[in-house]
């Protein structure tokens, strides 16, 4: 009987201790954490906002605008315009004009005309006899 009584009181205290330990631990960390993070955060962005945009805005546009257009505009158009059209115009038309029309004109019509009619005429009349009758009449009339 005495052993049973000792076990009962032993099981009860550990349950009470666990509950008491969990309850006091949860509330204390939330209370001190919430006010500490908010307090130091609010004053930090206030002094940053006015200091950042004030010195940045006037410094960036002032030196950038006058420096970029002044040296870029006169340097780019002056040396580019005279150098590009002068050497390009005389070099391109001179060697291209005589080479393209001379060798292309005689070569294209000569081999094309005799090759096209020769193999085409005998192939068409063989399978189609009806087309043979009108084709020779047209050729004879043209020759006369």
UniProtKB/Swiss-Prot annotation:
Reported tissue expression: Expressed in fetal periderm, hair follicles and in the thickened epidermis of the lip and footpad. Also present in the epithelia of various tissues such as the penis, vagina, forestomach, tongue and esophagus.
**Where are the annotated sequence repeats, by residue?**
27-34, 35-42, 43-49, 50-57, 58-65, 66-73, 74-81, 82-89, 90-97, 98-105, 106-113, 114-121, 122-129
Ordered alphabetically, the record's keywords are: Cytoplasm, Keratinization, Repeat
One GO cellular component term of this record is: cytoplasm
According to its UniProt entry, the protein's GO biological process terms are: keratinization
Pfam families in the cross-refs: Cornifin
Q: 13 X 8 AA approximate tandem repeats: where is this region?
A: 27-129
**What highest taxon heads this organism's lineage?**
Eukaryota
Quick one: where's region Disordered? 1-41
Return the similarity comment.
Belongs to the cornifin (SPRR) family.
Protein's name in the database = Cornifin-A
Origin species, per record, is Mus musculus (Mouse)
The organism's lineage is: Eukaryota, Metazoa, Chordata, Craniata, Vertebrata
């Amino acid at each position: 009987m005495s052993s049973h009584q000792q076990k009962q009181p032993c099981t009860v205290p550990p349950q009470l201790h666990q509950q008491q330990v969990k309850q006091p631990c949860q509330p204390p960390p939330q209370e001190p954490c919430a006010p500490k993070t908010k307090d130091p955060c609010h004053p930090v962005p206030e002094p940053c906002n006015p200091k950042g945009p004030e010195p940045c805005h006037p410094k960036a546009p002032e030196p950038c605008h006058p420096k970029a257009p002044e040296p870029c505009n006169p340097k780019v158009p002056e040396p580019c315009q005279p150098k590009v059209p002068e050497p390009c115009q005389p070099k391109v038309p001179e060697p291209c004009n005589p080479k393209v029309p001379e060798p292309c004109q005689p070569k294209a019509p000569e081999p094309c005309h005799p090759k096209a009619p020769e193999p085409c005429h005998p192939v068409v009349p063989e399978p189609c006899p009806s087309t043979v009758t009108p084709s020779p009449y047209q050729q004879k009339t043209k020759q006369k």
